[in-house]
């Protein structure tokens, strides 16, 4: 099942690269954030997978409007998977 999520993630990143290469130049620079929303989405999907990465990208797109000041807004770091930082009650390998 993990393989399917990797394929979906690669497909989403390929679509974002297509947008950035062919569509974005026609629209001109519009993003008020650094990194741009498309770069943010590609990084989020690569770091967190297609499901959570897409959610983070959608939240970012929701903030990209004329009434938001914008600025530097990096993708959050991936959480560490140490037993001390986990809230689950199951054993860790």
Swiss-Prot record:
Could be involved in insertion of integral membrane proteins into the membrane. It comes from Xanthomonas campestris pv. campestris (strain ATCC 33913 / DSM 3586 / NCPPB 528 / LMG 568 / P 25). It is a peripheral membrane protein. This is Putative membrane protein insertion efficiency factor. It is found in: Cell inner membrane. HAMAP family: UPF0161_YidD. Keywords: Cell inner membrane, Cell membrane, Membrane. Residues 72-93 are annotated as: Disordered. GO terms for cellular component: plasma membrane. The keyword Cell membrane applies. The keyword Zinc does not apply. Belongs to the UPF0161 family.
């Amino acid at each position: 099942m993990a393989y399917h999520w990797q394929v979906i993630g690669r497909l989403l990143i390929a679509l974002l690269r297509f947008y950035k290469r062919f569509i974005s130049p026609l629209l001109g620079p519009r993003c008020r954030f650094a990194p741009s929303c498309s770069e943010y989405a590609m990084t989020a999907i690569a770091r967190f997978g297609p499901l959570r990465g897409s959610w983070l990208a959608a939240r970012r797109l929701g903030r990209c409007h004329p009434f938001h000041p914008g600025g530097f807004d990096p993708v959050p770091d991936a959480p560490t998977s140490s037993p001390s930082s986990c809230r689950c009650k199951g054993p860790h390998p």
